[in-house]
C-alpha cells in the first residue's frame, strides 16, 4: 500500500509539472499572436517584418512531443497573420475612392495598350537577292563609263599626236628652206631651233618660225578636235567638225601697205566681220561673190577698196583658191589687225587697240573629223600658198588715190572712236583732276610748319585763279569770233 501511495504521489507531482509547462506554452503562444497582430496593419508585412519564432532547446527525449506541439502552434499563428493581412487588403480594395482625389487620372492615355496594338513584323529577305549582280548594276555602269572615258582619252590623245607629227614631217623641209629658225619654244633667251612642235595641250600644237625677209615671224597652230574628250566625241556624231590649221604671219611695217582684205567661205566671213575689229570697221559691206575673178561659189570676198581686190586676185592666187577651195576656211590680210573686238564691262575702251600688219590663214583638214596621218600631206600646197602670199603682200602697193582713200578711212575710224569715247574721256580727265587736287590738299594738311603750309595754300589759290582767267579769256575770244 505504501508503494501504491508513493506511486500516486509521483503521478500527481508529474501531472502538476506537465500542466504548468502546458500553461507556459499557451502564454507564450498568446504573446506571439499579439505581436503579429500589431504588425498586421501594414500591407508589406511579408517584406519588411521578419517574424522570429521562439525556439527552445529541449535536451530530453521526453520534451520532443511538447516541442512539436509548440511548432505547430507557431505555424497556425503565422497562417492566421496572413489571413488577417489578406482581409485588410480586401477591405482597402472594397472601400469607395474619392473622385476629386484622382482627378485627371482617367484622361491619361494608356500607352502600353497602344504599343501592343501593332505587332512588329519581320520580313524574311531571300539570301540570293543580296548576292546577285543585279544589286550592283549602278556601280557596274559607273566603272564601265570610267573605263570607256580613260580608254577614249588615251586613244584620242595618241591620235592627235600622230596627226601633228605627220603634218610636221610633211612640212618640215619646206619650212626649213624658207625660215632660219623652226620650232623655237621660247624657253631660252636666245632664239634656238628645236625642230619639233610645242604641245600646248592634248589637242593644240604650236610651231614658231622666224628668220625670213619681210616678216617678223610665223606662228602655226594645229587645232585638232578634242578626241580625248568622250563627250565631245559623242557631240561630233550629230554635228561633224573638221580639224584646222591656223597660220599667222606678222609682217614688218615697211613691207606691207595699208589695206584690209579677206576671202573665204561666206559663213566664215560673216562670222569674222562680226567678231574682228578691223573687218567690222573697214569692210562694213556684205561679202561679195568672187565669180568675177573665177572663184567658186563657195568663196566670197571682203575688201576695203576695189583696187585691193584687183591687186591681190592674180592668176596664181586664184589657182590656189579654186583648186583647194574645200580646204580653205578664210584668208585675212590687214594692216589694222588687233584681234577680236574688246568688250569691256564699263563701256568702250578709252584708246584704240594696238594694231599689227598681219596675214591670217585658216585651213580645214580633210576628212571632217575622220582624219588619218596620210591626209596631212594634202595640206602642203596650202603652205606654198602662204609663202607666196608673204611675197605678194610685200610687192603690192596702192596708188596715190588708193593711199589717200585708205588714210581717210583710218582717220574716219579714229574720229568715230573719239566721238564715242568723248564722254568717258572727260569723266576720266575729271577724275584725274580731282585726284590731283585731293593729293595736293593732303600734302598741305600734312605739312607741320604753319608758315610753309600758308604759302602752299596761297600758291594753290593763285593757280586756281589763273585757270579761271584763262577760261574767261577763251570765252571772250569765242564771243568776238561769233560777232
UniProtKB/Swiss-Prot annotation:
GO terms for molecular function: calcium ion binding; protein folding chaperone; ribosome binding. The keyword Membrane applies. Residues 21-135 are cytoplasmic. Residues 450-483 form a coiled coil. InterPro entries: CCDC47 (IPR012879). Disruption phenotype: CCDC47 knockout leads to embryonic lethality at mid-gestation, between 10.5 and 11.5 dpc. Mutant embryos at 8.5-10.5 dpc reveal several anomalies including vascular abnormalities in yolk sacs, developmental retardation, atrophic neural tubes, dilated left ventricles, poorly developed myocardium, and paucity of blood cells in the dorsal aorta. Yolk sac endoderm cells show alterations associated with endoplasmic reticulum stress, including lipid droplet accumulation, endoplasmic reticulum fragmentation and dissociation of ribosomes. Pfam families: CCDC47 (PF07946). In the embryo, expressed in the endodermal layer of the yolk sac and in the small intestine. Residues 157-483 are lumenal. One of its GO terms (biological process) is ERAD pathway. Residues 473-483 have a biased composition (Basic residues). It comes from the Eukaryota. Component of the PAT complex, composed of WDR83OS/Asterix and CCDC47. The PAT complex is part of the multi-pass translocon (MPT) complex, composed of three subcomplexes, the GEL complex (composed of RAB5IF/OPTI and TMCO1), the BOS complex (composed of NCLN/Nicalin, NOMO1 and TMEM147) and the PAT complex (composed of WDR83OS/Asterix and CCDC47). The MPT complex associates with the SEC61 complex. Interacts with VCP, HSPA5, DERL1, DERL2 and SELENOS. Component of the multi-pass translocon (MPT) complex that mediates insertion of multi-pass membrane proteins into the lipid bilayer of membranes. The MPT complex takes over after the SEC61 complex: following membrane insertion of the first few transmembrane segments of proteins by the SEC61 complex, the MPT complex occludes the lateral gate of the SEC61 complex to promote insertion of subsequent transmembrane regions. This is PAT complex subunit CCDC47. The lineage of its organism: Eukaryota, Metazoa, Chordata, Craniata, Vertebrata. The gene is Ccdc47.
